[in-house]
Amino acid sequence: MGKLTILVIVAAALLSTQFMVQGDGDQPADRDAVPSDDNPGGTSEKFMNVQHGSGCPWYPWCG
């Protein structure tokens, strides 16, 4: 009976660590979701976003 108890405890510990590593997995809503466009202007506007305020890419040095 002692070996069975130890076996059950070890099995429970292994299952709990497996669930912790896997997490809850991908939900169907997450997989089918369309990624949002967080940069609608494209990469040029992403890197040159300093132009938006004054129209000058070198903002501190533009008169």
Curated annotation (Swiss-Prot):
Query: What GO annotations for molecular function exist for this entry?
Result: ion channel inhibitor activity; toxin activity
Chief place where the protein resides? secreted
Region Disordered: start and end of each range? Answer: 22-47
Which residues are annotated as pro-peptide in the record?
Answer: 24-54
- Provide the alphabetized UniProt keywords: Amidation, D-amino acid, Disulfide bond, Hydroxylation, Ion channel impairing toxin, Neurotoxin, Secreted, Signal, Toxin
How is expression of this protein distributed across tissues? Expressed by the venom duct.
Instruction: Give residue numbers for the modification (4-hydroxyproline).
Output: P57
Query: Does Transit peptide show up as a keyword for this record?
Result: no
Q: Which Pfam families would you find in this protein's record?
A: Conotoxin
Query: Could you share any additional remarks the record makes about this protein?
Result: Exists in two forms, due to cis-trans isomerization at 56-Cys-hydroxyPro-57. The cis conformation is the major form.
What does it do?
Its target is unknown, but this toxin may modulate voltage-activated calcium channels (Cav) or calcium-dependent potassium channels (KCa).
Supply the name of the protein: Contryphan-Lt2
Species whose genome carries this gene? Conus litteratus
User: Upper lineage ranks?
Assistant: Eukaryota, Metazoa, Spiralia, Lophotrochozoa, Mollusca
